[in-house]
Design a protein with these regions (language model features):
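A short beta-strand-to-loop transition that corresponds to the Sensor-1 phosphate-sensing loop
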Residues: 1-3, 82-85, 138-141
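Interdomain hinge/linker at the junction between the two RecA-like core domains of SF2 helicases
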Residues: 2-66
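Catalytic core segments in nucleotide and nucleic-acid processing enzymes
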Residues: 28-31, 99-100, 111-112, 132
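C-terminal helicase lobe and adjacent C-terminal extensions/tails of nucleic-acid helicase motors
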Residues: 49-81, 86, 90-118, 126, ...
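Aromatic/His-enriched, Gly/Pro-containing loop or helix-boundary segments
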Residues: 123
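Conserved two-lobed SF2 helicase motor
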Residues: 127-143
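Conserved ATPase-coupling elements of RecA-like P-loop NTPase cores
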Residues: 146-150
Length: 412
């Protein structure tokens, strides 16, 4: 809903490429009350920074207020999104110290493994969960294709269209009234989005009132017109003229090797961390009494062929990794071997359940490399995940990577 009309960019091509709107009257849909009126954005916390303790009190207060409204079922599902995993974990700790209100508090960040992620989403989608007060503490991972329906939302402001994405997880089916999303200032969004033209335009040219209007009227085209103006201006400058004389020539000549060398869409490089933790073979599904399998019969049979079987419903990550090593180090046929290729594909799918990604230059990855594991076979193997210090274990199935534990655990 928030994607720009990139056909408005002035790209110096010999032939103008036509861009077709899949919905020519898209604005009429976006401004329909069933879409635009599902959620009311609130700006009480928008202009002044708030500290973590006051934010926790505010979230609790509004959640209690929603639960007690006439016509509600006496419970509330609240979601709060932070820019950083660190802030999400800190907020979790603050909430635990408050007077108990929520029956369940879930943490969903980029270091939570896929089985736990599915466990959380299934719980939120289970109709019986509507009998509980639930708080979901998350990061931007919740913005991409997570089909949940919450009652109240809170979000650290970042990008306007990102704010709208979070709102898409509140009153998703437009069946409730009184659903709100509160935007607050805690972490500086420039840490993640400082180079993003959308973020720059908001800071330089969009007032608080205009920010509110764009979200209220779903007029994201207004923002992208400013962004396109900036990009078009940059494209006219001498320092990007090599686009016309160099890069464009490679594209027109279908010289894909040169295109690959000269064009990079995503600058940051991620590293994949493997956690050799025991994982459940199945978790509760969104239907009460029914289990969802995390590994297929074929995947479990593949592991069994190497002598690895689940024990008490858990699959040992250390044993899974040893299977991967055996696959890599065994003798490979000189010719193409379909069975071997299929085996590696199955193995990659299994490995993905035990992994998460970190930005290559991030502080937490550099700290992990200070003795918590080793780099091997394309992964960072987190061998010390169970080590525990004053601030808890380095890695926990429900909490993900514990940054605070990195400070007080001595690794050998």
């Amino acid at each position: 809903a928030t994607l720009p009309k990139i056909g408005k960019l002035r790209i110096p091509l010999k032939e103008r490429t036509g861009f077709v709107d899949l919905l020519p009257q898209a604005k009429s849909y976006m401004q329909n009350p069933n879409f635009a009126g599902r959620v009311e954005f609130r700006f009480e916390l928008f202009q002044e920074e708030i500290d973590m303790n006051d934010l926790a009190d505010f979230v609790l207060g509004k959640s209690v207020e929603y639960r007690d409204k006439p016509g509600k079922n006496g419970t509330v599902h609240t979601i709060i999104e932070f820019i950083t995993k660190k802030s999400a974990a800190e907020f979790y700790a603050f909430i635990q110290e408050k007077e108990p209100f929520f029956d369940e508090v879930f943490l969903l960040s980029g270091t939570i493994l896929e089985p736990r992620r599915r466990e959380i989403i299934n719980e939120l989608k289970n109709p019986l969960s509507r009998k509980k007060n639930i708080l979901l503490i998350t990061t931007q991972v919740v913005e991409a294709g997570v089909d949940i329906d919450m009652d109240l939302g809170f979000k650290n402001i970042s990008l306007i269209d990102s704010d709208e994405q979070l709102a898409g997880r509140v009153n998703r089916n437009a069946c409730k009234v009184g659903c709100e999303v509160y935007l607050f200032r805690l972490d500086n969004a420039s840490v993640l989005y400082g180079k993003d033209k959308r973020y720059q335009m908001v800071r330089e040219q969009i007032s608080v009132g205009e920010y509110e209007r764009i979200l209220r009227e779903k007029d994201f085209g207004c923002l992208y017109e400013l962004v396109f103006e900036k990009i078009n201006w940059m494209n006219e400058q001498t320092y990007v003229q090599n686009f016309r004389s160099g890069f464009l020539r490679f594209v027109e000549g279908l010289d894909f090797q040169q295109v690959d060398r000269n064009f990079q869409v995503i600058e940051q490089q991620n590293e994949t961390v493997f956690v050799p933790i025991p994982l459940p073979v199945e978790v509760d599904s969104m239907t009460e009494g029914v289990k969802e399998r995390l590994f297929s019969d074929r995947e479990l049979q593949f592991l069994e062929d190497f002598g690895v079987v689940p024990c008490e419903g858990l699959l040992d990550g250390k044993e899974v990794w040893e299977v991967y090593e055996r696959l890599v180090y065994r003798d490979h046929p000189a010719k193409f071997d379909l069975e071997e290729k299929v085996g590696f594909k199955i193995m990659q799918r299994i490995l993905s359940c035990f992994t998460f990604s970190l930005v290559g230059y991030s502080k937490e990855l550099q700290e992990l490399k200070g003795g918590t594991g080793e780099e091997k076979l394309g992964y960072f193997y987190l061998s010390h995940w169970e080590d525990e210090g004053v601030n808890g274990k380095l890695y926990d199935y429900k909490m993900g990577l514990n940054n605070r534990a990195l400070k007080d655990i001595t690794f050998i």
